Curated annotation (Swiss-Prot):
Homodimer; disulfide-linked. Seems to also exist as monomers. Belongs to the FIBIN family. Transmembrane segments: none annotated. The gene is FIBIN. This is Fin bud initiation factor homolog. Residues 1-18 form the signal peptide. It comes from Homo sapiens. It comes from the Eukaryota. PANTHER family: FIN BUD INITIATION FACTOR FIBIN, FIN BUD INITIATION FACTOR HOMOLOG. Its main location: secreted. InterPro entries: Fibin (IPR026772).
């Protein structure tokens, strides 16, 4: 009988330690109200809230480790009305947050109905800008090629003009040499003619003086 009582007390203590049936204790994190239960059934003070699931059961039972007259327990525990009040405030806060998000989204969308249309419009604008830049680059390349062709034509024209001037100068030089050779021959012929005329004049002079 004593063993049975001892077994029941140990079993009850084990249940009190391993199962948390207390109220929804608020855990304030980033201004939001969270309620957790321990998945493995072994409640500890250092349980990670991120690994605990949300508890939807509403209870006003106090924690096993806290007495009924504990001032800290009365401050930490919330009634059902208070919890619904807090939840209502959270809903209002969430509504305001969603309203701000919708305003920021509408501002980001720039008058479009959805992100898909906005992204399609942006992609069209980017495509148009890319096509315009590609067209401008093509025009610049064609103008550059035209400038190169004009420069090459001007250079070839200058080369042709220079070669033409060289040929013309060479022909003029040859003609001048030919003329100078002809003038030299004429000069020699003229000198011979003058000498012959001088000889004849001297002979005529001597003949005239003798008479």
């Amino acid at each position: 009988m004593v063993f049975l009582k001892f077994f029941c007390m140990s079993f009850f203590c084990h249940l009190c330690q391993g199962y948390f049936d207390g109220p929804l204790y608020p855990e304030m994190s980033n201004g939001t109200l969270h309620h957790y239960f321990v998945p493995d059934g072994d409640y500890e003070e250092n349980d990670d809230p991120e690994k605990c699931q949300l508890l939807f059961r509403v209870s006003d039972h106090r924690r096993c480790s806290q007495g009924e007259g504990s001032q800290v327990g009365s401050l930490l525990s919330l009634t059902l009305r208070e919890e619904f009040t807090v939840l209502g405030r959270q809903v209002e806060d969430a509504g305001r947050v969603l309203e701000g998000i919708s305003k920021s989204i509408s501002y980001d969308l720039d008058g479009e109905e959805s992100y898909g249309k906005y992204l399609r419009r942006e992609s069209h604008q980017i495509g148009d800008a890319y096509s315009n830049s590609d067209k401008s680059l093509t025009e610049l390349e064609s103008k550059f090629k035209q400038g190169q062709e004009q420069d090459s034509r001007q250079e070839s024209r200058l080369n042709e003009d220079f070669l033409g001037m060289l040929v013309h100068t060479r022909s003029l030089l040859k003609e001048t040499l030919d003329i100078s050779v002809g003038l030299r021959d004429k000069y020699e012929l003229l000198a011979l003619t003058i000498r012959s005329h001088g000889t004849r004049l001297g002979r005529l002079k001597n003949d005239y003086l003798k008479v």
